[in-house]
């Protein structure tokens, strides 16, 4: 029993060491990224602790950039387009990049519906928003790529729908210049 207790204690200690090691290597990577960016006068703050990557930078001229990759919280309002009904976010697929007055948002979703049904939903949504804008619709065997460009507002929305096994993968990207 004493040996079993010692083995259990050793196992717990080693598991704890794994967490400590993981945290230490995370911090080492953060510092390496920050250090490499500082060579051209850019100040960076990198955080890998939340399951994704958050980074904020200020370059030598004072321009700031914020980036979240993997776990950015992105809403329908942020994108300017609804999520397909019943779809679920694809883990690790969201990204937000804000640089000066420009922003780029990306979101991955998964639906159990067929690609043609999902594409029809987004085609209708983009058509309803298309007055005075350019709508491009490229269908292919396994889905569709839809793009709405607003040259006046310097913005675009892209929706890519692709066939997944018995379902659909959806990628939505919103780009805006001069965003607040």
Spans of features found by a protein language model:
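An acidic-aromatic pocket/loop used at catalytic or ligand-binding sites
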Residues: 18-180
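Bacterial N-terminal signal peptides that target proteins for export
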Residues: 1-5
